[in-house]
Amino acid sequence: MNELAQWLNLQTEKHIVLGYGSLLSKNSRERYSNIYTQGIPVTVSGFERAWVTRSLHEKQTYVGAISNAHSQLNAQLIPTQINPALQEREKDYQFVAVNPQDLNFHLHQGDATPSLEERLSAFTFWICETLDCEPASEEYPVHQTYIDTCMAGCLEHGGKEEAERFVAQTSLWDHPRVNDRANPKYPRAALIKSDISNNIDKLLANS
């Protein structure tokens, strides 16, 4: 039995959110959403990630998932209840069900088998699709601490290659950006060490 199958056998929640933004960060989801389960890296087909989610109340722009049959994005399986705390965090999105056949576990050895497919069918998978797509602007910029939170989660769970996937599988990087590391403005920012920030800067510079 591979790691993924073992992980699925341990889950008691039947709902699994496909976290592709700040939920990628273990630190952020634990501190702000009380989600303490370990995430599993996955690639989701049928959705494009882009800088299109405008938060009117937070005056920022976040990544969002848009239905696109020709695109894919990297994410993490996050078992959790769809509770008020999570709904508040994701209030600029709608929860959309995803077919298990659209999930690719590229970081785990072993191809999909009938037994694995059977295990996956026991869960309902959800992705947060953007309700209203608006690109970042000077009034609603992207904040560096949000980018850091997303990419630190990728580095933690999948290393440099997973962080590179986040950059490559996200559209509209040409946007107004605020470097708020000295005074974080993103309200669910992860606690990130300076060496991780430096790695993120290098990855962004090379993209």
PLM region spans:
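A glycine-rich, hydrophobic/aromatic-adjacent loop/helix-cap motif
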Residues: 1-207
